[in-house]
Amino acid sequence: NFARTAPWWRYVDGACWRAPEGPDSNVDRRQNHPVTHIAWYDAIAYCKWSGLRLPFEAEWEFAARGGLSRKKFPWGNQLVPKGEHMMNTWQGDFPKLNTEDDGWSGTAPVDSFPPNGFGLFNMTGNVWEWVQDFYGPRSHQKRLPERDPKGPDQGSQRIQRGGSYLCHKSYCDRYHVHSRIPSDPTNSAGHSGFRVAGDQ
């Protein structure tokens, strides 16, 4: 039974993209939320259609840092500086109770928290973001070009960055700018999305 192995998921009868929380809901109030349930291949299809692309992992991390170096988060090293939540993650007892101290239990509108030094919102928390690269060893574990390093040329998994609203220090504290996870590129989830990059 999936509910026993992943107790933070729940079945919602009648849910679909037009009614994400069930038959009495709609997407009207979600227009400023990140797009979710996106597999890597979905993100690639959108990029081809729009003339944009997914960022490479190194580009994503550079953008996430917002001009800071050697910091855990886009704003510094404190998770909640001066008691102010800076990203959408799980608060409370994971997975039993989300106290919503940051104001959200699921995705949050993209401008709910302050932007980083480059003016980018939600580089950590809210939804995991696909990047272009195949998953492989960390760049610092092998010799890569100093400028524009790319991941392996092949593999079975792609990389997601940034963490999500389901991340909690007791379970998944991968909401730091340097954290990453391997993911099957055919999988999607309610906490997976993407952002695009462009070339000048």
What are these regions (language model features)?
Residues 181-189:
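C-terminal/domain-terminus segments
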Residues 188-200:
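Short, structured beta-strand segments at or near domain termini in extracellular proteins/domains
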Residues 1-181:
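Functional-site microenvironments in short loops/helix caps that host divalent-cation chemistry
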